[in-house]
């Protein structure tokens, strides 16, 4: 299952520095606007201690973690929706992502210029929100015009679309994002085909200085208060610290560095886990001598759907799923031992896969 998060923010908020820490790709982190001319795409390995533990027990030929794609979207500026700065092209890049990671500058540094001349994360957030909302309003307007023509012919679908698109339009005109529009459940399908930017789930990252990475600062507190109503998660990360961690070769050095700062894990790990929560994802495992592998699924997926993530044939010809809970696998040390102790269950088509399940699918095509 592909998962793509777009990192957005005004120029010089620490977006590309954070991206460099997250991925194997290296964007040019320069102290001037628009250093990210093309959207950089990086692939992040999702850290999971359970995968490491299973690998120790099974000793496979290879270990395959699950990954997340991160896209570094060029710095947006006022007027982006009208083509200013790098404009429409990059709003299009955001449209292709599953979720938005919004980086806000929450540190003072006279050596790093700010496009608006001062540090104000709420102003920065509102600038980005406004540009995305304007672009969404344009998309809703276009579809609404088509739906109104259909409605005039007596088309039921057209009338329904007009009703709910009008709600989205009014909501956006009030300077609010589509994700908070008062439209529930299946009625939101009227916007499925136009992929509204502000309907995507969002995670806010406060890029703070080293001294504020544990408890935050005045800027991050303002951000937390401002996004309360959205119900969005806010993370404290120091891109500068993450850069230092990434430059350390040994795990021991990294752990020692983190401990000195009062941290238990790198900020990028917290960010990846938060992205999982944001998209309602979970992980199951396959474990054999050839390969131990982590697979990403959406929470609530049934066994056949989870099997389909490996290959569509697995879903089409699904017969059953031999399932061991992760804790049982670790407790008994192997699939055979778990089976002997009655901890291997045979699950059918209705089984909802649990996070951490170790699975073996039987199928016939």
Model-assigned labels for residue ranges:
Residues 2-8, 13, 19, 146-352, ...:
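C-terminal-of-GTPase-core extension/linker across diverse P-loop GTPases
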Residues 96, 354-355:
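Short, flexible surface segments
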Residues 30-31, 112-116, 216-218, 248:
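Short amphipathic alpha-helical segments
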């Amino acid at each position: 299952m592909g998962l793509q998060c777009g990192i957005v923010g005004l120029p010089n908020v620490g977006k590309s520095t954070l991206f460099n820490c997250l991925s194997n790709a290296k964007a040019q982190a320069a102290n001037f606007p628009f250093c990210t001319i093309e959207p950089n795409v990086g692939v992040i390995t999702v850290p999971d201690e359970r995968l490491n533990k299973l690998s120790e027990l099974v000793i496979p030929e290879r270990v395959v973690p699950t990954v997340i794609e991160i896209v570094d979207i060029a710095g947006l500026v006022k007027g982006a929706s009208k083509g200013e700065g790098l404009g429409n092209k990059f709003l299009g890049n955001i449209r292709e992502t599953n979720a938005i990671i919004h980086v806000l500058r929450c540190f003072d540094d006279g050596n790093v210029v700010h496009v608006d001349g001062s540090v104000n994360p709420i102003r920065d957030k509102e600038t980005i929100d406004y540009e995305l909302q304007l672009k969404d309003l344009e998309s809703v307007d276009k579809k609404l015009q088509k739906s109104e023509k259909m409605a005039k012919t007596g088309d039921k679908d057209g009338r329904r679309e007009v009703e709910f698109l009008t709600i989205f339009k009014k909501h956006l005109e009030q300077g609010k994002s589509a994700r908070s529009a008062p439209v529930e459940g299946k009625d939101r399908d009227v916007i499925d085909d136009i992929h509204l930017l502000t309907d995507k789930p969002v995670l806010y990252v406060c890029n703070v200085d080293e001294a504020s990475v544990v408890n935050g600062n005045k800027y991050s507190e303002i951000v937390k208060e401002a996004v309360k109503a959205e119900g969005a998660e806010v993370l404290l990360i120091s891109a500068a610290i993450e850069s230092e961690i990434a430059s350390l070769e040994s795990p021991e050095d990294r752990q020692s560095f983190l401990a000195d700062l009062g941290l238990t894990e790198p900020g990028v790990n917290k960010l990846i886990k938060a992205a999982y929560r944001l998209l309602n994802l979970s992980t199951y495992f396959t474990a054999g001598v050839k390969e131990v592998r982590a697979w990403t699924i959406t929470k609530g997926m049934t066994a056949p759907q989870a099997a389909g993530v490996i290959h569509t044939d697995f879903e089409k010809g699904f017969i059953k799923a031999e399932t061991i809970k992760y804790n049982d696998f670790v407790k008994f040390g192997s699939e055979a031992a778990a089976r002997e102790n009655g901890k291997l269950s045979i699950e059918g088509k209705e089984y909802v896969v649990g996070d951490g399940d170790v699975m073996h699918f039987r199928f016939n095509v």
